[in-house]
Swiss-Prot record:
Record organism: Trichophyton rubrum
Entry keyword set: Activator, Cytoplasm, DNA-binding, Metal-binding, Nucleus, Repeat, Repressor, Transcription, Transcription regulation, Zinc, Zinc-finger
Identification of the protein by name: pH-response transcription factor pacC/RIM101
Keyword match NAD: no
Record region (Disordered): 1-48, 177-235, 383-612, 635-737
Biased composition (Polar residues): 448-469, 490-518, 709-721
Sequence ranges of Acidic residues compositional bias: 637-649
Amino acid sequence: MQSASSLQQQQPQQQQQQQPQQQGQQQGQQAQQQQGQQQQPASQTVQSVPVQANLQHAAAAAAAVAPPGVQQVAPNSPSAPGSLECQWQGCQELCPTPEALYEHVCERHVGRKSTNNLNLTCGWSNCRTTTVKRDHITSHIRVHVPLKPHKCDFCGKAFKRPQDLKKHVKTHADDSVLMRSPEPGAGQRQQPPAGMFGVGLGPDGKRSLGPVPQAYGHPPPQYYQPQHPQQQPNPSYGNVYYAVGHDAAHQASYESKKRGYDALNEFFGDLKRRQFDPTSYAAVGQRLLNLHGLPLPLTHAGAVPEYQPMPAMVGVGGGHGGYQSAGPIPTQSYHLPPMGNLRTKADLMNIDQFLEQMQSTVYESDENVAAAGVAQPGAHYVQGPLSYRTTNSPPTHHQSHHQHPHATATAAATTTAATTASMMSTSAAATPASSISAASRSPHASTPALTPPSSAQSYTSGRSPISLASSHGMSPSHHPSTAGMYPTLPATTGQDSLSSSGYPTTVSSAAPPSTLSSVFDDDRRRYTGGMLQRSRPDIDLSTPSIKRDDADATAGKDEPKLSSSVIDPALSRASVDMDEDAAPHRSPSSTPTPTATTAAAGPDDRQPAGEQQWVENVRLLQRLRDYVLERLNNGDYVDEDKQDDSDKEEDAKSDKASPESASASDAATGAGEYPSIKMHGMEAIAAAAVAHEEGRDDQMPRDDEDQENPSTPTARSTTTMLDAEEEAKQAGENLYPVLKMAVDDDGADTDGDEKMGQ
C-alpha cells in the first residue's frame, strides 16, 4: 500500500517536471521558425507585411474597446518586438520601440558630418524633404516616427516635437474658465465631452455603445490616468499663469484713475488759489461740472480706491496635471502719488472750509436754488413735523430764527388793536397793544394776535402769522395748529391794503400785507446769515420805471425810512433809495420778483436737467467733504514740523548763494547806480565788467553820494535825458566811462526819437 501511494505521489511530480520541458521545447521551435522566416527570400518577406498591418489594426481596435483609464500595450511597447519597421528606402529593419527606430534612422541613414556620411534629404518612403542642417532633418524625422515624448500637462496628449507642444498649450488658455466657477466641484467634468464615447460592456455582458466610464477618482486631474510617472514640465517653456475670479469690467485702468486723480488735484489747487468764487452758484456749478463722470479716488460712494490689489493667479504645471496653485507670486501693485495741493493738515482744513462755503452756497442761496429749477426757496428744508428734505446733507446754519426777536416784538408792541374784516371775519374787536406784545412773547400762545406789517421777515409772495411765531422763537410744533385757521385770499395792491388796514404808517415804510398765504409759505423762509433777509429788487434802483412813477403819483404823503434795528444793513441801499424818491416801498406781494416768480412755478415748470445737476453737485460736495474729513481723522497728511525743517534747510542753502547772485545781478543791470538808464546786450555786459574791475573801494564814495542825494533817481526819471547826462557827470564821470558812453548813446537816440515824434 505504501508503494502504491508513493507511486501516485511521484507521478504528479514527474508531470510537473515534464511541463516546463515541453514549454521550453515549444519556445525553441518558435525561435527556429522566426529565424527560418528571416532566412526566406525577399518575396516571402513582402507577403508578410500585410499580415503585420492586420496585426496593427487589431491592436488599435482592442485599444478603442478598452476603457481609457487602462493603458493598452501599444505597438511601440517593448513587449511587442519587431512591430516597427524602418521605411527608409532600401531598409527593412524592425525596431522594438519608437525610440530605437528614431535612433536607427538618425545614426544609420542621416549620419553625421564627423563620420563623413551626413545625409540631409529624407528618404522615408516618398518624402524627399531636403534641409540645410542636421538638426532640421532630425526634427523632421519625428514626423514619420511614432515617437511622442512631449506630453501636455493639461490633457496628457503627447506630441512629437516641442514646438508642437507649445502651440497646443496656447489652446488651453480658454480652459481657465473651469476654475472661475465658485460652486463646489466646478473644476470637475460632470459629463464626458463630445467625442468621448466608445464601446463598453453592458449589463448583459454584451458590448454596447454608450458613454465611456470615468476611470479616475475625485478630483480628476485629466481625462485619463497614465500609469507611468508624470514627467516634469518641459524646460523649453515656462509656467503659464492665468487670472481667475475677477471680472475685467470691474477693473479700472490706471489711465482713467490718473485722469480723475489729476482733475481732483487741480480742483483743490483752484480752491486754494481762489480761482473761482465759492459764493457764486454759477461758478461753483461750472467748476464741479468738470469732476462729474470721472473716477475720483474717493473712499466711498463706490469710487475706485487708490490702492488696487492684483488678482489671484493660478499656475499651470507642477507635475500633477490640471490646474494647481503656483504658490506665492510676486504681485506688481501700484498706487497714485500724493496730491500736491492736499498734503499738509492746513491744506486739508482750508479745503474743508472752502467746501463748506460752497456747500452753503448750493444749499442756502434761494435765488440759486430757484434758478437751478429745484423747487421754491426753502421747499427742501421744512421745519416742524413736516421735516422732509431731498438731500442727505444738513444746512450749515438753521438757528437764526431767534436772532432778532426784539425787532418784530417792537413792531408788534406799537401797532394798534384793530383788525380789518378782510383779514379775519370772526373777530373785529380791538385788542390792547400790551396784550398783543404779551401774546407775541408768550411761548404757549398758539397763534399771534394779528399779522404784523413786517416786510423784513419774509420775501415770499404771502404773509402768514406763522412767520411772526417763528420770529419770536416759538416752537415749530405749534405751526400746524395755526396753519389751517387762515384761508388763501386774493392779492391786492399795496395802496389798497394801506388804506383799508388799521395799521399806522409810522411803523414801517413797506405796505402791510393784505393777504394770507398757504401753509408752506413760512417753511420757505430762509434762516441763514444770522439776520433776516428779503429778496433783491427786481429792477435797477438807479433807473426810473413806469411802476415807480405811478407809485410816486399816488403817494399821499412821505413815509420815514425803516430803523436800522428792523432790517439788516444789507438792505440799506433800498432804504436810501426810498428816502430819495419819497415813495412807499412796494410790497413783494404786489409785484413779485423774478425769483419769486420762478419759485411760484409749479412742479411741472421745473427743469429736470437743472434739478439733476443740482443734486449731483450736492452729492459731490458731500463726498469731497467726507474725503477730506476722513483724511483729517486718519492723520493722512504730511507733518508740518518736518516740512518746516526741510524748508529752513532749503532757505539756508539759498541764502548762501544769494549774495553772489545779488551782486552779479546788480552789476549786470546797473540798477543801483542808474535805474533810469536802459542797458541791453553788450552794454550790460560791459557795465558788469567795469564794476568788477573798479572794486569795492571805488564803489563806497559812489554809495555815499547816492545817500546824500536821495532824490537823484526820481529827478533823473522825470527829467529829460540831457539833465541825466549832467547829473551823471557831476556824480562821478571818471568812475563809469562805459556807462557815460551808453548814456550819450541813449541820449542821442532819445533826441532822435523826439524829433521823429515831432
